[in-house]
Amino acid sequence: MPDTAPQLRLYNTLTRTKEAFAPIDAKNVRMYVCGPTVYDFAHIGNARPVIVFDVLFRLLRHVYGAQHVTYARNITDVDDKINARAARDYPDLPFNEAIRKVTESTNAQFQADVTALGNLQPTVQPRATEHMDEMRAMIDRLVQRGVAYVAQDHVLFSPSAMNARKGPRYGALARRSLDEMLAGARVDVASYKRDEMDFVLWKPSKKGEPGWPSPAGIETLGRPGWHIECSAMSMAKLLEPFGGGLKCDDPERNQFDIHGGGIDLVFPHHENEIAQSCCALGTERMANIWMHNGFLQVEGQKMSKSLGNFITIRDVLNDGLPQLGEWGDNTVRDRWAGLAARLSMLQTHYREPINWTAQRLAESADELHRWYGLLRDEGFGAPEKLSHASAVAAALCDDLNSWAAITALRQAFKVRDVAALGEGMALMGLLDPYFVTASDVPIFARADVDASAIAARIAERLNFINAKNWAEADRIRDELLQEGVQLKDSKDPATGERITTWDVVG
């Protein structure tokens, strides 16, 4: 841990407060984040938690050491949506083969897309199909403890039975009673349920559907419910390797540090995960800190296919930001667009709703262009340590205050503190060494452009604008355009201040 590292504080959805982060074991910091269901291309809303928790992963590695942090992000490859996509896309193949084609191709695309967004690979990415044994064992334990029951070849969890026991209460994360949750939720009404709020841990597979040997003495093949998958995978990757699990009766060993995901997962998914894990493992908390990122809109509207504003990560990467022109192979172009998308996302605090706009994406690309131009001009190399990233680290240690971190990067750029800029960008996942060191990147071929002189003229123009001397402001703009430098004016959405960016044209 760096000697000068500030105290990391994170907002905990469970307590509704910002808390000092104290890992269970500083040598084994553990985080689990709900990953994709691999049946279709991931959309930009899916990108947000990937980016947010990648920044946290980087920060934890910076504070505690890379070898002391384990980050698990699951892959859901058992789901009714996968079955439906397989039947639609591969009707002539055996069903299991069709499912494998859907999950393998979709997962490969997801991995390529999130890598282009500048994300590190998680330490482990467990797949649901690889952890059926753990799911069955947890379900058997829940039945034995009287909080789950068998009905018509289903196994169901009973929240009311959980709340009749001593220990954690169902509804603590969502801060709602059973009656309130029932009134506000869409629940499956089924004759085999004892109570409407009971949820499925295991269900029978229909003919032709994928199936596995069932728990709880059920003779037919079946498959797991969504919620038990994450309980089992987090146990397998974050508890059992560190002495916890079903064979452990030490509650502290059966908890990990951080669980993350989108705000839409608070109920029912995360509430149900907590119920399953706490009852099976005998602990008060599945994870000590629960973190959730806010919703995403597109150009001020909810993203939906019916509105025609449904944007995948791949759409963003294919957008063709102007800096690269027609140059570059697809991988390089993806990486540049991915960095711009990452910076655009991080300009909004992770807990706040975000409005995705094409203008913000373009402005982010312009800003990165200027930052990388300075790094190249000053011969910045890939940093081995991040000893000059203290301002960015301090901002991120305040509940991942990415806006304050970006403000620190802008200040470093303004005063030409190359070490602080480059290392701060690295800590946020915004530094791609290729764009710093490659000699053939055309967007940085600006030997005849004096960036500092342009910045001075932009500042002079801003003074004229503030003085309402429009003629002189226009004169500077027109002179720069004649020299091949085009100015673009916009407003900072947070402060309302004018932002002027520039690009070489012609």
Swiss-Prot record:
Its cofactor is Zn(2+). One of its GO terms (molecular function) is ATP binding. It is an enzyme of class 6 (ligase). It catalyses: tRNA(Cys) + L-cysteine + ATP = L-cysteinyl-tRNA(Cys) + AMP + diphosphate. A motif ('HIGH' region) lies at residues 36-46. A motif ('KMSKS' region) lies at residues 302-306. Binds 1 zinc ion per subunit. It is found in: Cytoplasm. GO terms for cellular component: cytosol. It comes from the Bacteria. Pfam families: tRNA-synt_1e. ATP binds at residue 305. PANTHER family: CYSTEINE--TRNA LIGASE, CYTOPLASMIC, CYSTEINYL-TRNA SYNTHETASE. Monomer. This is Cysteine--tRNA ligase. It comes from Brucella canis (strain ATCC 23365 / NCTC 10854 / RM-666). The gene is cysS.
